[in-house]
From Swiss-Prot:
Statement: the UniProt record of this protein carries the keyword Signal: yes
Domain notes: The presence of a 'disulfide through disulfide knot' structurally defines this protein as a knottin.
Disulfide bridge partners, by residue number: C107-C121, C114-C125, C120-C130
Annotated source species: Schistosoma japonicum (Blood fluke)
Protein name: Egg protein CP422
Main location (coarse class): secreted
Annotated coiled-coil segments of the chain: none
Length: 133
């Protein structure tokens, strides 16, 4: 009887280990924001919209931002890389464009997407948008 309990315990531990190992996703697989489909380390979920994404390998030190012509959003989940700014086509979505460097001395005006304080003319980047102090 005691031997049966030991075998059952070992089986239970091994089953839990394999269930955890299979519950995460690998490179190229679809992940989601609810973490019901999460990526296995070292992969991260690169979101294509607010709910879904694809497991990718990203340099942890690299900032994820968008370039000229790519679609950005007001939630700052898709930000433009400097020197590009998000030109909004509606209240939520826009396209990364290059601002005229003659306007504002090359800095970003209020309500434009930013990554750092120094990107903004006001020197204040708050929650991904420039704001006046």
């Amino acid at each position: 009887m005691h031997e049966c309990m030991i075998v059952f315990f070992i089986f239970a531990v091994v089953s839990i280990y394999y269930a955890d190992a299979e519950s995460c996703l690998y490179l190229g697989q679809h992940c989601n924001a609810l973490a019901t489909k999460k990526c296995c380390p070292p992969f991260t979920c690169k979101f294509v919209n607010q709910r879904e994404g694809i497991c990718v390998r990203e340099d942890p030190g690299a900032e994820s931002c968008l370039y000229l012509g790519q679609h950005c959003n007001a939630l700052a989940t898709k930000k433009c890389c400097p020197p590009f700014t998000c030109k909004f086509v509606n209240q939520r979505e826009g396209i990364c464009v290059r601002e005229d460097p003659g306007v504002g001395g090359g800095c970003l005006p209020d309500k434009q997407q930013c990554r750092r304080n120094k990107d903004c003319c006001s020197k204040s980047c708050y929650r991904g948008n420039c704001r006046s102090k």
